[in-house]
Amino acid sequence: MARGSGEPPHKMAKLDTAQPTNVIIQFQSDVGETVGPQLDVPHDVTPKQLETLLNGLLKQEEKLPYSFFVNEQQISEELGTHLLKNKVSVETALRVVYQPQAVFRVRPVSRCTASMPGHTEAVLAVQFSPDGRQLASGSGDTTLRLWDLGTQTPLRTCKGHRSWVLCVSWSPDAQMIVTGGMDGALWLWDPKTGNPIGCCKGHTKWITAVAWEPAHMALPCRRFVSGSKDTTIKVWDAQTRRCLMSMSSHTLAVTSVRWGGDGHIYSSSRDCSVNVWDAQEGRLVRSLKGHGHWVNTLALSAEYALRTGAYDHTASAPSDPKEAQSKAVQRYEAARGGRPERLASGSDDFTMFLWEPSTSSKPIARMTGHLQLINQVQFSPDGRWLVSASFDKSIKLWDGVKGTFAATFRGHVGPVYQIAWSADSRMFVSGSKDSTLKVWEVASKKLKLDLPGHADEVFTVDWSPDGGSVASGGKDQVLRIWRQ
């Protein structure tokens, strides 16, 4: 018996973990601003009830959906249950951090609605147009193919490359496509006709990456950047097909390029570095060092907004160029969320770094946990999450602002090659060497759907900007479209 008590010890232990009837909470935004007074709420308050309380405090005309976090753990059940599970002390006012969610909801893709043969070698790259109406695919058969998403049928076969088409990128205004090949050439295409606009030559080895200047900086889109095995980065004018600048401070192959929204170009290389360039002058601003092996992949926190320009999740954009540019500016600023642009890098050294490259050459965080090389990193469209795909067959989820670890997703039985997010940031899809696609849910940290169907390795995946379709391609030469 416990001293001074008529209760046996096991009953005392139960009393110690009893939930308080009420909890004092303080709402705080994800940038640290306190909202409203401290509130006395019942311990069984739900996330939906917290949402109603917060909308009342914010006095907004439109009631918005929110996610709530305590100590960076999302509340997905009654508050008291969440606090007990996570051993959170409530001796002082509890800081409840809120984040707005997308006002629209993407439904998970669940079935293959089209298997589109046509390529005669492996499909190496797929990308949806910013307006979500077309899909472009690049293949080892040297062609770019365009597909109509309304009818799920082939539109055009674009010929020009003399070797594998390694990368495909739509301009953010949906008016052009650039492809980079194993032959070292860059081809520009008119997606309306499938005709070549012209060829850009200058690289001496194969093209590893291409990226367009964002629409909020220039419309119509004219400039794009390419990276190559020849160690250089080149900026091109799409209308004249001339090389405007050639930047060469990397000592080994360039593996990835990104054109940021604040006037910088980012490049990663097998020389273990990430370089930050001034996009107007081609001057090296700073070099980000820390990786111990090849840097394979880069991702930008505002990438979804940069890729889609003036096109929102309904696939609509103003027809007037000035209005379109203004909308692209608004979408980029909203994606930034009042913070500097963040960059993530993933490497053969099994680690990732999170950077604020416009302000510092020191990383915000070093992210460890993968047991093999990292193939790809990708920010969610709202910039709050970061996922990494690895040869260790796992996917890891990280906080996109702080770089802290959130979850590991296991289910693939082969290396994970690529990942793509749904437009509402609630799900992502992965493609693997094991021939499957898998849809994962962020809130539950679990597998949502398994999508078998490919006969061999899945090299490339993309989720349409409107959220309605997923495209995948790989070694079996067949392009597949997946829908709800």
List where the protein language model places each region:
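Short, contiguous acidic and Ser/Thr-rich linear segments
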Residues: 33-48
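A conserved positional marker within WD40/Gbeta-like beta-propeller blades
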Residues: 143, 185, 204, 232, ...
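A structural motif specific to WD40 beta-propellers
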Residues: 111-114, 153-156, 195-198, 242-245, ...
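WD40-repeat beta-propellers
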Residues: 126, 138, 144-147, 168, ...
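Loop/turn segments within WD40 beta-propeller blades
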Residues: 127-132, 169-174, 211-221, 257-263, ...
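Short acidic beta-strand-loop surface patches of small beta-rich interaction domains
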Residues: 34, 65-86
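WD40/WD-repeat beta-propeller blade N-cap
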Residues: 116-123, 159-165, 200-207, 248-254, ...
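Conserved strand-to-loop turn within each blade of WD40 beta-propeller repeats
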Residues: 137-141, 179-183, 226-230, 267-271, ...
